[in-house]
């Protein structure tokens, strides 16, 4: 008959405690009217309570701090801090003590120990203390593995370890939307607007210290989250410094291509990586958290092989009087084009000039400007349409309708105004 040997007692004891900020002590005030049976008894008890504030005893919030009563929640972007203590509970001197702390995540194992050198000896009732820090960068299950090895006086080598399992939660819900800007000429530009919606999905308020956009190398960014009032920048969020649980805040940014890249149409056309958001917040007693998103990507606007944009156009024109517009034609392809311009009249818009004229060769990423004249025979808001560009090399025609809109008024109305 086999008998399992008794479990061997270790000479050292391992204790692990998470280090977090304390919280303000709260109490539940119990009061009554003076004419009630207890009289002033409850009020006197609150005045004698050391946890209450003098002169404001009925407030739940006190001046004293309390240590955390449980492990609490750990959120992505926060710093996980833990106190590790190895105590010699025996009456023997222990030698060659090595304490190792590893953090096991779903993808990697990290060594958090400040030193990997062994301690020569540890006398009775003495301890080895260590504090570890780690910025949490993954969500999901984490396991803190603390291993202790040592040698007894008899030369026997001992080893034991403990596991501490905890979950890392997501603190923020970040949603982004991209908008390709349109100029006042009703044409798509190279500017990109980014709207970031940030929601606090924790159970405590957050102070949003910084929400910035780090653009990619091809863009400059301008934050649109403040307004200028009397020479002073004021945030658009007003006096709301805190983001309450489940509340959402929207941030807006404008990205413009740098000059050296804006002049190269083919480069900007294929750019999908915009940049990444850097979010910094503070919670209980200034406990800091930081979160960086991955590289934000957008769908690149489809300009086709030839891009037509308007450089100048009047807002209001007179009925049956010529007006001028300036067009910019850009070759977004990787080949040279030989272009022919055709102008087709519509029911309300009539082009002035020669249709079918040669524009010449246009090299890749190159542009040319055209001054065109037209008139409208119908009042009201009219759409400028009817431009056709034909590449004689490939016999391919590009049609451009609804390029812009103009308001057409009669001459009499303009004279009277």
Swiss-Prot record:
User: According to its UniProt record, what is one Pfam family this protein matches?
Assistant: TRAPPC13_M
Gene behind this protein: TRAPPC13
Output the InterPro entries linked to this UniProt entry: TRAPPC13 (IPR010378), TRAPPC13_C (IPR055428), TRAPPC13_M (IPR055429), TRAPPC13_N (IPR055427)
Q: Report the GO terms under cellular component.
A: TRAPPIII protein complex
* Quaternary data: Part of the multisubunit TRAPP (transport protein particle) complex.
- Family classification: Belongs to the TRAPPC13 family.
Name used for this protein in its record: Trafficking protein particle complex subunit 13
Taxonomy of the source species: Eukaryota, Metazoa, Chordata, Craniata, Vertebrata
Q: Which organism is it from?
A: Bos taurus (Bovine)
């Amino acid at each position: 008959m086999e008998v399992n040997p008794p479990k061997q007692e270790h000479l050292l004891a391992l204790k692990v405690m998470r280090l977090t900020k304390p919280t303000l002590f709260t109490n539940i005030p119990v009061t009554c009217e003076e004419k009630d049976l207890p009289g002033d008894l409850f009020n006197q008890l609150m005045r004698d309570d050391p946890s209450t504030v003098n002169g404001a005893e009925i407030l739940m919030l006190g001046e004293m701090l309390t240590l955390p009563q449980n492990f609490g929640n750990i959120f992505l972007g926060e710093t996980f801090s833990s106190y590790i203590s190895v105590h010699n509970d025996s009456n023997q001197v222990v030698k060659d003590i090595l304490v190792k702390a590893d953090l096991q995540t779903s993808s990697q194992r990290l060594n958090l120990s400040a030193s990997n050198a062994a301690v020569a000896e540890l006398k009775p009732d003495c301890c080895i203390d260590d504090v570890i820090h780690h910025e949490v960068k993954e969500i999901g299950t984490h396991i803190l593995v603390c291993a202790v090895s040592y040698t007894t006086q008899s030369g026997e080598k001992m080893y034991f370890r403990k596991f501490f399992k905890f979950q890392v939660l997501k603190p923020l819900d970040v949603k982004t939307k991209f908008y390709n800007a349109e100029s006042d000429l009703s044409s798509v530009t190279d500017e990109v607007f980014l709207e970031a919606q940030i929601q606090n999905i924790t159970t405590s308020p957050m102070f949003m210290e910084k929400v910035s956009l780090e653009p990619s190398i091809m863009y400059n960014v301008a934050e649109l989250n403040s307004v200028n009032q009397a020479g002073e920048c004021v945030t658009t969020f007003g006096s709301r410094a805190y983001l309450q649980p489940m509340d959402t805040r929207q941030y807006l940014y404008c990205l413009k291509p740098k000059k050296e890249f804006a002049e190269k149409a083919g480069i900007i056309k294929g750019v999908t990586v915009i940049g990444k958001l850097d979010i910094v917040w503070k919670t209980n007693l200034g406990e800091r958290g930081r979160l960086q998103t991955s590289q934000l990507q957008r769908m690149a606007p489809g300009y086709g092989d030839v891009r037509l944009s308007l450089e100048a156009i009047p807002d209001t024109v007179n009925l049956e009087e010529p007006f001028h517009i300036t067009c910019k034609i850009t070759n977004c392809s990787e080949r040279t084009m030989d272009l022919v311009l055709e102008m087709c009249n519509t029911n309300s818009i009539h082009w002035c000039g020669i249709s079918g004229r040669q524009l010449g060769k246009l090299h890749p990423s190159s542009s040319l400007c055209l001054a065109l004249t037209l008139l409208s025979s119908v009042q009201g808001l009219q759409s400028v349409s009817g431009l056709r560009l034909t590449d004689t090399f490939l016999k391919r025609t590009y049609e451009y309708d609804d390029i812009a809109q103009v308001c057409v008024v009669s001459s009499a109305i303009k004279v009277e105004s």
